[in-house]
Amino acid sequence: MVNISPPPDSPAGLPDWLASFTNWEKQLPLDRGRREWGPLRCRKLLDRAGLSTDSCKVIQVAGSKGKGSTVLWLEALLSIRGCKTAALTSPHLISLEERIRICRNPVPFEKLLPGLQRLYPALLAGQAAGDPLPTFFDLWTALFIEIALSEKIPYLLLEVGLGGPLDSTTAIPHDVGILTTIDLEHTALLGDTCEEIAAEKSKIARDGKPLFIASGETSAVSAEIATSRGAIPEICERDPRIPEEVSAIQSTNASLALRALDHLWPESPLTSEETTLAWNQLELQGRLEVIPGPPELLLDGAHTPASIRAFVDEFSRYRDRFNRQQGFTGSNLKSGALLLGMLRDKKPEETLSELKRLNPLPQICTLGIPVPRGMDGEAIAEALVPVTAGSGITPVVAGSPEEGIDWLRKMAAIGEPIAATGSMYLAGMVRQAWLPASQA
């Protein structure tokens, strides 16, 4: 039995109190043995707190990339219909408050604390009965449900934090499952190939419930797993209701969101006009986001081979547009500057190899992200050797995030188009440094 102290009375004490609960997100190695019991711990806590989602419609979103964007699409589309939503997402860009949103707005710590205090008796009862100690994610998921129910929110949107069937969110039975694009990530936990990862993540599928699957190389594997679990799989192609200007990546996410809501509203599907309104409202922070500055910056949290591939395509367009606007031609064309930061469990060599498609290669600065899973800047530079070979580019290694961000500003000052990518953690740090506090 662990002695759990009461939640703090003020936001200042919350980080230390939360740190007393195991956080898989901050630990290495992430292997199969360390993830067992995930949903069972959370389920026990929910039951002891008397928290039931039977009165709500629950949509669970798993996948390798596009989960957060799909949740944003769901929020926007639901808001067009005047529906109240609660969204549980991870990771956050700047503040932990971002991980729980009510009607698209982060819930401030001042409102989270009463929810934790209401959960505290259930935590104590569980320890007295010999329940396993909940992890940070178990606790945060239960807090999300507590807050959503107290606000009488009818639509709950759950972004799977890691994997699928072992994630804390799987303690909550969903009405609709979504599987976004699959890519190589967390291979020690999920599998060594995209097919193995797809098979693992597809296990969120529930008997008798639909699983909407992003079309791709692994979608057939996912559909097979879903069928074996009694779910109703549907592989989703690009939906014709989506505006033509929406990128391929966001079209995939929007198509999944639309089909999920079509299932909930079979008599009144969303229209093209409503989808366009949702697109116009969408704020995709840290996802191929252009921050006006000055100086202007292309910011992206890409961290898998496919998402870096999309970043490369966008950076090429961004750089070409910059050179045209500045009137640079021939030998005066600017190659740009790129700040890179990654996590250690993201297959860096394979992911970064996509940068070879940039011709010419931009100047590069690497930095270590200051989290336990962060990859050292020197190690990132070493992983870049096959990319930079023969290019004349030698990556600069920043000694700190501040130094890396300062390098970006200096490159902008000499007229280079600038960008940052490699991790949502990096995107959050750069965004906070780039924007005034009121806008970050």
What are these regions (language model features)?
Residues M1-G63, T70-R81, L88, Q127-A128:
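Short functional linear segments
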Residues L30-R35, P39, K44-D54, I80-T170:
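ATP-dependent carboxylate-amine ligase catalytic core
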Residues C56, G126-A128, K152-E159, H174-E273:
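Acidic, Mg2+-coordinating active-site environments of NTP-dependent enzymes
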Residues L74, P165-D175, R431-W434:
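Short Gly/Thr/Asp-enriched flexible loops that form oxyanion-binding sites at enzyme active sites
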Residues L88, P210-G216, A337-G341, P362-V371:
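Short internal beta-strands
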Residues Y155-L158, S168-T170, H174-I178, I182-D183, ...:
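Nucleotide phosphate-binding/pyrophosphate-handling subdomain across enzymes
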Residues G216-E234, S251, E296, L352-P417:
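C-terminal helical cap/extension that packs against the catalytic core
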Residues S423:
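Active-site-proximal loop/hinge segments that shape catalytic or ion-binding/gating pockets
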